[in-house]
């Protein structure tokens, strides 16, 4: 989904996306600021459950605006279910968002509080659709698990991912990434917020059931700087580090954010 017609800096930063992707001003855009006093405690919600098979981890790819760890998604070996979801959602990739400083790199904020980075685990509705591409534009097509990251102690669970970044320094590079269980990156608390939203970068489809974990995970300043050392240029081009790739919070426009605590 990496296109040179959009980015995170002017002249084609987030405020300009609407020119090419009118849905950027839609009613269900993400991320949002989660105002905890306005969330609705919903007793019908269940804890979400993940079952990830480490053998489905496949490769790591520099997509120009971030990097993705991709998973084999031809069967239901790695799935997210329960919580607010009607069926099984299959893991296709995870990626991170970060900022040019340690203070602010998250996409979601909580009561206006910004976090250092954010992990997104992207899943598609395999109970109803036959591929990520088919599901990605459908209202019930995707589920993304969001985990806020706070600068502090180094997180040893991130090390395997960080160690692989040298192999995908420039845009378009990919390398094998095997035997990894991303549930190791999740916080221990089952608490979450959920709402209807969108992909946070073009094509910005309003197809996402968001599950944002209430508890954050740690990342050190040094680990964060490794994200920023990735390059958005192809090999041989002028080195342009990916300094930041976080879209600002979007208007809620009457949506309800439900809480499972």
From Swiss-Prot:
PANTHER family named among the record's database cross-references: CARBONIC ANHYDRASE (PTHR18952), CARBONIC ANHYDRASE 1 (PTHR18952:SF282)
Binding site for substrate: 200-201
Active site: 65 (proton donor/acceptor)
Provenance organism: Equus caballus
Name the record gives this protein: Carbonic anhydrase 1
Compartments where found: Cytoplasm
Modified positions (N-acetylalanine) in chain numbering: 2
Keyword check for Ribosomal protein: no
Binding, Zn(2+): 95, 97, 120
Function of the protein: Catalyzes the reversible hydration of carbon dioxide. Can hydrate cyanamide to urea.
Gene name for this UniProt entry: CA1
Domain Alpha-carbonic anhydrase stretches: 4-261
Enzyme Commission numbers on file: 4.2.1.1, 4.2.1.69
Keyword field: Acetylation, Cytoplasm, Lyase, Metal-binding, Zinc
């Amino acid at each position: 989904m990496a296109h040179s017609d959009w980015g995170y800096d002017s002249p084609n930063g987030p405020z300009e996306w609407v020119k090419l992707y009118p849905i950027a001003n839609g009613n269900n855009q993400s991320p949002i600021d989660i105002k905890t006093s306005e969330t609705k405690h919903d007793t019908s919600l269940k804890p979400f459950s993940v079952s990830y098979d480490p053998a489905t981890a496949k490769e790591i790819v520099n997509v120009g605006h971030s990097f993705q760890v991709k998973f084999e998604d031809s069967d239901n070996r790695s799935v997210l279910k329960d919580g607010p979801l009607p069926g099984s959602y299959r893991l296709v990739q995870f990626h991170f968002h970060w900022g040019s400083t340690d203070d602010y790199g998250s996409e979601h904020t909580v009561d206006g509080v910004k976090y250092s980075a954010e992990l997104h685990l992207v899943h598609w509705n395999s109970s109803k659709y036959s591929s990520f591409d088919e599901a990605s534009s459908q209202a019930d097509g995707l589920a993304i698990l969001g985990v806020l990251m706070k600068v502090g102690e180094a997180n040893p669970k991130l090390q395997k991912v960080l160690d692989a970044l040298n192999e995908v320094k420039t845009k378009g590079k990919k390398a094998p990434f095997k035997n990894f269980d991303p549930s190791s990156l999740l916080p221990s608390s089952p608490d979450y917020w959920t709402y209807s939203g969108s992909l946070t970068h073009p094509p910005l489809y309003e197809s996402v059931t968001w599950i944002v974990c209430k508890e954050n995970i740690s990342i050190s300043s040094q680990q964060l700087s490794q994200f920023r050392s990735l390059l958005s240029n192809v090999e041989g081009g002028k080195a342009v580090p990916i300094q930041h790739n976080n879209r600002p919070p979007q208007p809620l426009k009457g949506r309800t954010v439900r809480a499972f605590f």
